[in-house]
Amino acid sequence: ETAKNMTLMLLKLIYNIDLINLFASSNIEKSKLNIKNLSLKNRIGIAGGLDKNAEYFHIFSSLGFGFVEVGTVTLEPQTGNPKPRIFRFTKDKTLVNSLGFNNVGSVQVLNNIKKYKPKFDGVLGISIGKSKNTKTKNAWQDYLHLMDYFYLEADYLAINISSPNTENLRELSSQENLEFLLEKISQKKVQLIDMYKKNTPIFVKLSPDETDENLKNLIEVSEKNSIDGFICCNTTTDHIYPITGGMSGAMLSKKAGDMQKKVAEFKQEKSILIASGGVMNASDVKERLINSADLVQLYTGYIYQGNSLLK
């Protein structure tokens, strides 16, 4: 975690002294895309979790990324789970984390977005989640308050109900809980569209640990409630390491790729599919795009390879 934070601080230093272009990629295919009201310069983005507090998204766009997802953000600041909580398995090009939505809270994140957005050239996604101490039955209130905060500033919102590191969060994926939550979110969005005259797409971030039956039901419930697409997928608790937490990286690649094919099969054609999880190289990106992904996110692959992955 310290290494990750130092790397981000170094990126900021390089940006501040106007040397960021030395590290920017000119190899990412640039084309004007329009997907669900999102105007993108390319299909490659940063996944939620890397820029938790919206302090670096403008720098990632300068490096060549077409979109950046910040967060996950909760209403109030959270310290997250006890440290150490990120473990690197270099031989396997894998991470296991038990972070637990550590972030500075919605007020400060919104301030950061307003501060850095004028320097940002890309699509900004904001991942939102319930607070650790919020009971499942009250989680909808957190998400609606967060929509109030971020709807206007976000190019899209990601509903995180799939992190394994916040207690009871995955309970929101059950059909009954999800139906209730997404009905509330859908109703709120209608109000916000009327208020701001802006249709901000809303995506649901999926867990790779769902059964096929649950996954199909989850997608049906989401589309019934006007969700615009899906992010496939979050970290998995199904791993070989003797550590509690969610695994990402190369060891997730096959599971995430297989799940993406199922999501593509189950979803309606109009629903957007963002591939995330185990994307480690250009071949992985191509494979995800071939298998119906509209956009692709990087996280652990970028942690291990840095900007060389873009080149």
Label for each model-derived stretch:
Residues 64-78, 161-163, 229-237, 285-310:
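Glycine-rich phosphate-binding active-site loops on the catalytic face of alpha/beta enzymes
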Residues 53-62, 141, 210-224, 265-269, ...:
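Catalytic cores of alpha/beta
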Residues 46, 68, 109, 126, ...:
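Conserved, mostly hydrophobic/aromatic
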Residues 1-33, 97, 102, 106-107:
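An N-cap/entry alpha-helix motif that binds or orients negatively charged groups
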Residues 37-46, 120-127, 191-210, 263-275:
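Short beta-strand/loop segments at the ligand-binding rim of alpha/beta enzyme cores
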Residues 71-121:
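A gly/proline- and charged-residue-enriched helix-loop-helix capping module
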Residues 131-143, 171, 177, 203-223:
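Active-site glycine- and acidic-residue-rich loops that bind
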Residues 11-29, 165-177, 215-269:
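Glycine/Thr-rich beta-alpha phosphate-binding loop at enzyme active sites
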